[in-house]
Amino acid sequence: MSAKAVSELSGKEVLYKYFEPSGLLSAPHAFHVKAGENFDEIANKYEWLARDNKGVIKPDQLIKRRGKLGLVKIGTPQELKAWFEKTGDSYVRVGQTEGRLHTFIVEPFCAHTEKDEMYIAIYSERFRDVIMFYEQGGVDIGDVEEKARTVSVPVQLNENAMTPSDEELTTLLGPLKDSDIVRRFVVELYKAYKDLHFTYLEINPFVLLNNQIHVLDLAARLDETANFLCADKWKSRLTPYGGPNHVEFPAPFGRDLTSEEQYISEMDAKTGASLKLTILNRKGRVWTMVAGGGASVVFTDTVCDLGGASELANYGEYSGDPSESQTYEYAKTLLSVMTEGTPRPDGKVLIIGGSIANFTNVAKTFGGIVRAFETFVSKLKEHKVTIFVRRGGPNYQEGLRRIKDAATKLELPIHVFGPETHMTAIVGAALGVKPMPTVPTAPQTTGQFLLSPERNTGGTERAPPSPAANATPTEHPLTTAQQNKLKSFRGLFEDDTKAIIWGQQAKAIQGMLDFDYVCRRSSPSVVASTYPFTGDNKQKYYFGQKEILIPAYKSMAKAFATHPDASIMVTFASMRSVFETVLEALEFPQIKVIAIIAEGVPENQTRKLLKIAHDRGVTLVGPATVGGIKPGCFKIGNTGGMMDNILASKLYRPGSVAYVSRSGGMSNELNNIISQNTNGVYEGIAIGGDRYPGSTYTDHVIRYQNDDRVKMIVLLGEVGGVEEYKIVDLLKQKKVTKPLVAWCIGTCADHITSEVQFGHAGASANALGETAACKNAALRASGALVPESFDDLGNKIRQTYDELVSQQIIVPQPEVPPPAVPMDYAWARELGLIRKPASFMTSICDERGEELNYAGVPITKVLESDMGIGGVLGLLWFQKRLPPHANKFIEICLMLTADHGPAVSGAHNTIVCARAGKDLISSLTSGLLTIGDRFGGALDGAARQFSEAFDQGWSANQFVSEMRKKGKHIMGIGHRVKSINNPDKRVEILKRFAMDKKEFAQETPLFEYALEVEKITTAKKPNLILNVDGAIAILFVDILRHSGMFTKQEAEETIEIGSLNGLFVLGRSIGFIGHYLDQSRLKQGLYRHPWDDISYIMPESNLVKF
């Protein structure tokens, strides 16, 4: 939802902060007190209340007409406290809604008379803002719409030009026209309204006292999508009293947010997906979990239309391609509420529904739902929950298979249906008022791209199949003569339409090209893409089996200049950048259509784009849309879903029925219903779910009326707004004469007493005429063909089509099979349709899921267990969860080997390379390349020699003797500087750690054996001590053999593949990097070795022959 009501305190604070520099507003420090809180403790922080001044207290919970309801108290601090303690936590009824009073605003009382009270309101419409003013305000103002004077301010790109003129202000203020302060206040208030992205602001009353305006009562809505623009402006003033520093958007009165609703709301705020949950009746029998904004409304409508309103437990949706874990959390939260309390004797039903998805991977989301079933399986059985599932879209077969497998494995009663079944057919079965739907024959895999049209989702008997195609393709659905006659009429999209795509959207572009190919277009519809964050390049795509290159441009201007025949731009820009992107695109006169996919575009920005596009004759589709499709010609982005759905819905060739809808998911459902009950879709547009879509129902219905290729129109409206009434007027005026089948979703709103925001930003009725029921009645009365419910929509479309066929207005043509479209390799692999040997294998790390895994351990568990870097190394190097003493040993080794001064070869090389001006990686690798048998590479050798001697049963004396006989140096023994008299502190640390059996809790036989060897070698020469390489290597072998974590074979393999040397390389890399950074800080110049430190030994001249 974009326009959200704010608390009175938040609304006032936002205005007080904005007006602070001007001093025009009196800005007292009001505060909230909530039921159960200590009134005195909070009130004592506010000096104005501590002085026994009068104050005002009233609920701040979006309640209208509080004065008339007796919910305003004026009095001393003690009187306010007494009223608060009496009223807090009490229940009151406002209209049809009963709710608890829990949050109150307390502010200073402004003494005045009724004649001082004035009224002002500002609200936004599609192409204008309206300012209403009346010099008499307060609770008894009466019908303000009749009394108030108004000024309209047209939307313009330049906001500074959007201000009422002096003449308009004079007319607006009436008897107060000479009041300079009131005049300034109106001008500044409207400026604040625009800058702060209000969508509605009403102050009733405000008074003028002592040359300042006092705002006594306020109601407002802010455009929540403008948060990225206004986050700082929406913060309250800095005060010594504390209080919230952010805007509060309270739940509607009568609907306190439950902990579950709050949790889902917080999840929704952190993801690009849409997650909504409203609990209507915790003890209800009928629960829904529906994918898609429009579909969620349709399912709720159907429950209510079939008599289940009193049992409806919740409203909600999950859409926008949520991840498996997000779907799991959503489902788990829903099931936790559904299965709480005492089980009902008649059990409960859970309806998991949705329209046919455009791009959401159904199997992925259903994986999360199955996990939730597994978590709550005992509770689901205890509460006798019966589950009904209906879904379609990408990979839906795999998703439905997972649900069926879960039903068998968990022994749960789950009835599963795909897009072969009408979307809401499962609702009647779930409520027990209709028989269980039959399951028609359906394709079994998404891989069957040339699908036989056996799918019937229209809720009607199947239409007889079209005659078999002749060898010679027949024009469809018009004859050649008819087509020639209509060549002069061009719609938004034709079979030669070309588009430029804004954004890095390879998948969407490939989908458009596949659609072009299956429609038998002679050339691709996408001629270029543009994205300002990459350089000019060419990107590879497929047009059928053929590889093609499509240019990508950094500059949009260059893209359109290079491709003057491109008339459409599809922009995938985010809500933050879409305004500037579309504004730039509108500068190019060749553009006729711009499709805006992004959700969350601020309404003020959208309205400016609408204004400019309208003035320049450009059609906008969106924002918040999947786009549109014209079978046989063109599709926008991901419209129509996967290729299997496009083929099943016969979207590869034109039909005779055009439709317009708000919802992208529901447009896919309409594609199915129309294709199974008529000769197919001619064109379909999803205008988007925002309050101000770029183009309207009326725009497209008029286009369809004027296009003789369209024989029948379908309109899917919804609750909220008045756009459908324009269609009513067109019908009455006979400006639309073609058969119009219409249905407005959202009839459930009449059955829900508390305010609920449905799937789309514009789906909320603010007046009786905006309800779906009123719209449906008006459409029916004006001559539209309106079904009894959405369940009956397919029947109504079929009946209308049959009449047109009988009148020969539509003449069905033979079907021509589409060309085979190759399936994308990545998608085919995901579906399990193909396999090939992997080029790489890994067993230590997996980043593909929701969370990084180290050897199967989620990264969150790694951090929570506090295993340290030693534990991480154990997972990544050995695929083991090592014991604590082993983790600590690894960390000690890394610290001990981190550096040994600049004189050693590795550090020296790193320093020389750094001083030559090389980068970090080059300098580091130059140092690492010196590591070998002579420098740092003794760990593996020491481990191997000592292990072999110990395993053969040699004594320490025998081992030393055997090595001397072979003339081999004992790896890990000896040091150039250190000796028995000047021991290596690093080795001493390791010895103490290994001998402390409380900390190093395991046997160390090899290390003890090495100490015996050291006694023998140091007796011969003091510097033949066990060095740090040897100590590390031998102790590590003990860990491998005696920690209980490794088999003998694993221990030997670990030594053999060089793991021990890895410890030295990893540790010493720390020091090498330190040397590089040190040299860079010191800014040392190029190193050149001095001549006097080099012995030049040249051959005698008489020995060199030329």
Curated annotation (Swiss-Prot):
Transmembrane segments: none annotated. It is an enzyme of class 2 (transferase). One of its GO terms (biological process) is fatty acid biosynthetic process. ATP binds at residues 701-721, 752-778. It catalyses: oxaloacetate + acetyl-CoA + ADP + phosphate = citrate + ATP + CoA. CoA binds at L779, R780, A781, S782, G783, A784, L785, V786, P787, E788, S789. It is found in: Cytoplasm. Residues 442-478 are annotated as: Disordered. InterPro entries: ATP-citrate_synthase, Cit_synth/succinyl-CoA_lig_AS, Citrate-bd, Citrate_synth-like_lrg_a-sub, Citrate_synth-like_sm_a-sub, Citrate_synth_N, Citrate_synthase, Citrate_synthase_sf. PROSITE patterns: SUCCINYL_COA_LIG_1, SUCCINYL_COA_LIG_2, SUCCINYL_COA_LIG_3. One of its GO terms (molecular function) is ATP binding. Keywords: ATP-binding, Cytoplasm, Lipid biosynthesis, Lipid metabolism, Magnesium, Metal-binding, Nucleotide-binding, Phosphoprotein, Transferase. One of its GO terms (cellular component) is cytosol. Gene3D superfamilies: 3.30.470.110, Citrate Synthase, domain 1, Cytochrome P450-Terp, domain 2, NAD(P)-binding Rossmann-like Domain, Succinyl-CoA synthetase domains. Citrate binds at N358, T360, R391. The active site is at H760. Residues 442-459 have a biased composition (Polar residues). It comes from the Eukaryota. Catalyzes the cleavage of citrate into oxaloacetate and acetyl-CoA, the latter serving as common substrate in multiple biochemical reactions in protein, carbohydrate and lipid metabolism. This is Probable ATP-citrate synthase. It comes from Caenorhabditis elegans. The lineage of its organism: Eukaryota, Metazoa, Ecdysozoa, Nematoda, Chromadorea.
